Regions:
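Acidic, polar low-complexity intrinsically disordered regions
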Residues: 50-58, 91-97, 106-108
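Outer-membrane beta-barrel domain signature, strongest for Gram-negative TonB-dependent receptors
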Residues: 34-41, 46-52, 105-106, 218, ...
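Alpha-helical membrane segments in multi-pass integral membrane proteins
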Residues: 164-174
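Residues on the lipid-exposed face of transmembrane beta-strands in outer-membrane beta-barrel proteins
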Residues: 35-39, 90-96, 111-113, 149-157, ...
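Internal, conserved structured core segments that host functional sites
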Residues: 94-121
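Repeated loop/turn-to-beta-strand initiation elements of outer-membrane beta-barrel proteins
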Residues: 43-47, 102-104, 161-165, 211, ...
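Extracellular/periplasm-exposed beta-strand and loop segments of Gram-negative cell-envelope proteins
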Residues: 3-30, 53-89, 114-147, 172-206, ...
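Transmembrane beta-strands of outer-membrane beta-barrel proteins
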Residues: 1, 48-52, 108-114, 168-170, ...
């Protein structure tokens, strides 16, 4: 499940109010397919890569607007559906493998680069404050990209003849960019209503194990956790009359928890 949120201030100096608008996507359920590979070349170069694509099938969205500082005097809130959209994750890394204990323990320092996309949708509008209830036609989009290098450590332990345990930890630096289309806002331009730009960081941790069925085939389970956030950045709004306005993007936060079941082939 994934969660993502962002909030903006009333102006570029984080004033009046310091949180003007806040969007949250909570408990996004995602079906994902993923492929990846690891190879050691000439016993000195370790290469790894992965590609994953997922479909959002369920989730919740909240859109709140405030007149007072620190999320006070909330004058508008809608609670909406977020059961559509997709995600994309690409990562690759290279390192030098160290093998200890007759090869049972493997430790590999890594450097790499990753790219992550989220196409988040907002539908099924329901106005909570003021309590007007459901409203038709909501079909807004918020599309994100996190790109940048990372450093990490890959761990492997062959605990038995058929059982192998593994783990990874990565620290990422990211250029964050996002574009939104707020389809019901007639005063905004379409399909690009506003954009976000910021610098961010992230940490990715995964642990798992594989059980060998044959010499070339194993079953594996992988548990992964990610947490990303940005520094303050820029929110630039594009209006229907061609004008623009810039304010402070206070922060963007994204966390993800996943369980992956799969098969592994050895060549």
């Amino acid at each position: 499940a994934d969660n993502l949120d962002f909030n903006i201030a009333g102006d570029i100096s984080e004033c009046c109010p310091n949180v003007l608008s806040e969007l949250t996507w909570n408990d996004l359920k995602i079906y994902q397919v993923k492929t990846g590979g690891k190879v050691i070349v000439n016993k000195i170069i370790y290469l790894q890569g992965s590609l994953g694509y997922g479909w959002i099938i369920d989730g919740e969205n909240q859109d709140s607007d405030f007149l007072g500082n620190n999320r006070t005097i909330e004058f508008s809130r809608s609670n909406n559906s977020a059961d559509n959209g997709n995600v994309l994750d690409v990562s690759f890394g290279v390192g030098y493998p160290f093998r200890l204990g007759s090869g049972q323990l493997g430790i590999t320092p890594l450097v790499g680069y990753s790219h992550h996309e989220q196409d988040l949708r907002i539908t099924g509008g329901f106005q909570t404050i003021p309590p007007f209830g459901p409203f038709p036609g909501l079909d807004s989009a918020y599309e994100t990209q996190w790109n940048g290098p990372w450093v990490g450590l890959d761990l492997l332990f062959k605990s038995a003849k058929k059982l192998t345990l593994f783990g990874d930890i990565e620290y990422h630096w990211a250029d964050y960019e996002a574009e939104a289309d707020w389809n019901l806002r007639t005063d905004f331009a379409h399909p690009k209503s506003f954009e976000h730009i910021a610098d961010g960081t992230g940490i990715v941790i995964s642990v798992g194990g594989s059980f060998a069925i044959t010499n070339r085939l194993s079953m594996n389970i992988d548990l992964a956790f990610q947490r990303w956030s940005t520094d303050p950045g820029i929110d630039k709004t594009f209006f229907a009359d061609g004008s623009t306005a810039t304010t402070r993007l206070n922060e963007v936060n994204w966390d993800s928890r996943e369980i992956m079941l799969g098969v592994m082939f050895y060549f």
